[in-house]
């Protein structure tokens, strides 16, 4: 539950019962766990700026806390601070390459792409698609290959998205629909029609 006050056209965030309780626990116990939970609460309510400090405090108190590192990286990513997010994700992925079912290494590839580090992005997307079947990763990997002049290889990956989509259950098909449609568009643009 989040409360918002509108004053003079501006929205001001008001603390929720949960954030008040967590701040009270932090004041009493100063535990990394409570800082991390406060950061997660802010992250979930899309208050990314406010999430930074609790996550950083949690990491300072418990440098092994992967959840706090991941939350901090997600907050930086959401704020468009891709290089800072990548720096954290690089370390996290070294500790656990499969963290969050592959979403951490996928996020690292995204951060590289969004910060213009295309070579690193290409390499990291390659690692993602070797271990996980994220259509978005296949799509961006193919687009980067195309940018590098490797059109046939890119077409192959786009065909792979379309081909794999035929075996998906309905719930997964809906989740991946955007990337499947984008792959079709790419293929049509390159003169390839699929039945």
Region annotations inferred by a language model:
Residues 94, 129-135, 143-168:
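TPR/TPR-like (Sel1-like) alpha-helical repeat modules
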Residues 29, 63, 97-99, 132-133, ...:
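Short coil turns that delineate tetratricopeptide repeat
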Residues 33, 67, 100-103, 136, ...:
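Start-of-helix register in tetratricopeptide repeats
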Residues 40, 74, 110, 143-144:
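Residue-level recognition of tetratricopeptide repeat
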Residues 44, 78-79, 114, 147, ...:
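Register position in tetratricopeptide repeats
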């Amino acid at each position: 539950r989040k409360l918002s006050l509108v004053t003079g056209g501006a929205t001001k965030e008001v603390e929720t019962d949960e954030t008040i309780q967590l701040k009270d626990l932090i004041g009493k116990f100063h535990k990394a766990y409570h800082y991390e939970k406060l950061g997660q609460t802010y992250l979930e309510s899309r208050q990314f700026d406010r999430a930074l400090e609790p996550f950083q405090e949690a990491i300072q108190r418990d440098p092994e806390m992967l959840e706090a590192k991941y939350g901090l990286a997600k907050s930086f990513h959401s704020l468009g601070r891709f290089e800072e997010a990548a720096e954290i994700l690089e370390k996290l992925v070294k500790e656990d390459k499969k963290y969050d079912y592959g979403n951490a290494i996928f996020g690292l590839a995204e951060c590289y792409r969004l910060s213009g580090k295309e070579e690193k992005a290409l390499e990291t997307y390659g690692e993602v698609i070797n271990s996980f079947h994220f259509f978005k990763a296949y799509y961006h990997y193919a687009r980067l290959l195309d940018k590098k002049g490797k059109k046939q290889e890119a077409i192959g990956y786009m065909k792979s998205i379309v081909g794999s989509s035929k075996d998906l259950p309905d719930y997964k098909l809906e989740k991946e629909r955007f990337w499947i449609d984008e792959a079709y568009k790419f293929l049509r643009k390159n003169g390839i029609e699929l039945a």
